[in-house]
Amino acid sequence: MPAWFSLDWIARQLRPSRWFASLMQVTVFFAIAYGIYLDVAWYWWVGTVFFYLIVYSMIGNNIALHRYFTHGHFSVSGPVEWLFLWTGSMIGLGEPLSYAMTHVIHHKYSDVPGIDPHGPTNGKRSIFIWFQSEVDPAKTPIVSKHIVGLSRKWGWLHRFYVPFVLANAGLLWLIDFKVFLFLWLIPAGIACWGIGWAVWRQHWHMEPNNSPLHRWDWVYEGLHLNHHLWPAAPNTAVRPTEIDWTHEFSKIFRPKFNWQGQPTDVKE
């Protein structure tokens, strides 16, 4: 047996990784081409757009993985938490624990070459997830009670992430191949590209910034500088002229916000 082929190597392949997210990004081109070839009814493509924009990008990434699991900006009911778990994990980028570890390092070592997992430090090519960096706890230790809590609750999903995604994808296939293709594979793959682009755009000029178009760009969180300045704030719109679309969308889940980290004296 080759030295690299070991139980430890197999275990690593089951966890979230760059190769799996990159596979999602590459596969989506073939999936779109096949979807066009199938010549399905128009509403399947409407479903694709909805699942890309709302289910995976807004709910899965922005609200679930980022605001809820990583930062704990609010609490929700049990059923909503499981909905968040599914919509976030099925994107292909990772689950609560891996996402939070990556994001914690991103905040702590923002724009530090060789350490910040994503953004301009890895170049424009990092829009393709393969060229982002994976977090190495030995190099950048993470000391966080919140991360420990995520590990205790969702460690099983971290260890068996790829089987979880593939099993759920298989269930969607059994329901209907078009559900699998148009409501998961295509929109989730596009979401991977969109998120890869967003984390690069949010750090133009090698520093976090607020997008001047944030009021119109409601899919990706545009007030990124505000988020870095006040990471515990549930609402990144800290000025009267700003709007945090992710915060506004999250209200449909009737969350209980933790306002302790919200600034109240920010001037224009």
Q: What are these model-predicted stretches?
A:
Residues 198-244:
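Glycine/small-residue-rich hydrophobic helix-like segments
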Residues 1-197, 233-268:
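Non-catalytic, topology-defining segments of multipass membrane proteins
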